Amino acid sequence: MNSSLNLTSNLIFLFFLPLLLWSQPQYTISTNNGAHPGNLFFHVGGQPPRTVNIMDSTGSLIHSEPFGLKGWAWKVNLNNKITYFDRQSKGWFVMDSLENVVDTVYCQNEYIADNHDFLALENGNYILFAYDEQPYATDTISPEGSPDETVTGLVIQELDSDHNVIFEWQSWDHYYMSDYPDINYSSNGIDFLHCNAIDIDEDGHFLISNRNISEITKIHRTTGEIIWRFGGAQSDFTFLNDYPFSQQHCIKSLGNNRYLLFDNGNQSDLYTGGIKRSRGVEYELNLSDYTATKTWDYVHPDSLFTPSIGSIQRLDNGNTLINFGNNQNINRGSVITEVTETNEVVFELEMDNGQNIYCANKAEWNFYSEPVVELNELNQQKKTQLTIYPNPSNSTFFVELKNQNETFRKIEIFNINGDVILSIPFLEQSTINIFPINEKLSTGIYILKATSNEHSYYSRICISD
């Protein structure tokens, strides 16, 4: 709820959420002091039960639910709705704050959506991608190649709200395997373009993270031309004060030519004296001389090396949330760390060994639960004294105070985001205790707050077609 639903301090909000204790993730919180106030969203992979979770700023789980093959990349997306991937149907699910699945999004043109990343935009469009396996005579490139190899490319699609393709990009038009000398041509199947993240830069063009070639690529959103490449064998940029990132995840545009990513660091030992380590890192790119300057990084005090998965998020208070996703090489679960701009740790959570998290994100968002309001114990007993009828309604409905000694002082109606959409004040000397609402409301669920001369009450009103 936003500030428009700023209830008095003695209101009690009871959240009726499916906390299934037997399936909750197992973790330890070692630090929680001054962290960002948003809720933490994460999906636990590995062995069942695979839960989707929301944790509040105190470290308490307020939502934990086993999702089976669903739930991958569980997060609040750009359209202010939860999105997650279903590994069985190969589609992205979009869920509103009432826990209704309001859309399911699949790749078009016979491509199969990949589970790594997905953008649901404010304008209703969707951006997703697919891996595209094609036969390739790699013996024409390398003596270790095969005349009938299978090579994985990439297809990016932008769909409108009706799932029509308005942009499609194919990597085969822009990438050449011969440009990348580190490809292992003796492997059975070559995962050439292993895209694991997509973002939109401040100028509207796409950013993608290609893990296996250690490259961040910027792609023109209408022409499909590659604008620049950062990292890897074909990098347009020279690193000034840092070693190259490798096998990275989670590219994020910060604006002003600054970019944030999770550097898995699979090749970091070549630059750190033989020690592999993962980190969060931020760069500023100079588009005049094509140089890259490291402006921030964070290496965990335990020098965690996360060979796969991981994520990073810059929060609106300047803190950075880092998910060291796969620590099975040292028999540890995922480690989620939040640090300030000066790298002070203000939050750290570690999952039990075997429980891995692909991505972790914070947002000031939660599923809607109808609040039960009590100003005192007597008011709690009297909350049935408010009646709304008919409910559901498709036209005029009535609000009635059952206690004849109570009269209205104010009636307010809120949408599920907590925005006031109707406010009706009454005179102090009003004797009205039944009142018709004639306002035409859109179909949906609303919260009605009735303030009387004695109490405040809340109830749900459903507007039907």
PLM segments and residue spans:
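Intrinsically disordered, low-complexity Ser/Thr/Pro-rich tracts
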Residues: 2-9, 66, 226, 408
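Residue-level detector of functionally pivotal "anchor" positions at catalytic/ligand-binding pockets or at interdomain
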Residues: 24-27, 364-389, 402-404
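Generic marker of residues within folded, mature protein domains
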Residues: 13-15, 108, 146, 188, ...
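Compositionally biased, intrinsically disordered/low-complexity regions enriched for serine, proline
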Residues: 15, 22, 34, 298, ...
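Bacterial Sec-dependent N-terminal signal peptides
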Residues: 1-25, 375, 465
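Histidine-/acidic-rich catalytic cores in large beta-rich domains
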Residues: 24-373
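A generic structural signal for short, non-catalytic loop/turn and secondary-structure boundary residues
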Residues: 16, 35, 291, 381-382
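C-terminal outer-membrane/trafficking sorting elements
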Residues: 56-57, 379-389, 393-465
